[in-house]
Amino acid sequence: MGFIDLATNLIFPPKCANCKELISSDITKKQIDPLCPTCRMNFENEKQRECNRCGLMMKFCRCMPKNMSRAQCSSLLKLVSYRPQGNDMAIRNFIYSVKHSNNKVTFDFIAEQMRELLISEMRGASLLPSDCVITFLPRSHQNKANDGFDQGYELAKSLARVMGIPMVKCFNRKLIAQEQKNLNQYERRLNMKSAYTPCEVEDEIKDKTIILVDDIVTTGASMASGARLLFAMGAFSVIGVCIGTTEKTKS
């Protein structure tokens, strides 16, 4: 922990990203945990949950929504199963914090968690960091203006740093695209078809495996839309990675 971080923690003691209780800061740690011990334990327990489709723990699960399969995505890596209407407040509050609080500690923590999944996936596919590029799905202009940041960009930036893989912005978000959470599955798919436009980065992603970052994946429409654009730009393959997925139904 650097001097500036230490001084900041002394003046503004860190609070748990989930329950908002003060966290005792350990100056010997290289990285601050954004969760208090109780919430961290709950988070780790959520990671041990089994996927209701394949029966594997979330860190081993590679299930993905049909939209992503149709778009030829290779896999979807996720940390937890997200149930927005469930009782798992530890996850719901944490996701809310990611979306609405621009906290570098939280993004770095998630990136370290994602790193473990990606290393395993890359080894299985014989991929080197030089074979890959990290990108993200841009947030809507309205939400970015409301909160002052884009959580997808922040997650991708932290993940690129811990993985030693370059991050490239591959999409722009159109102003006309609606907020996904208010749409049904069919409407989401139509909305996402016109939500993004490609950036002129073909030379940077051609023949690369693209690691596409998002916070929550529900129907996979956003990921699928991004993947199709990436393939059209010359990408070799697309791996999705997210904090959690709400996908529940069996294929």
What are these regions (language model features)?
Residues 1-251:
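Glycine-rich phosphate/pyrophosphate-handling loop used in enzymes and phosphotransfer proteins
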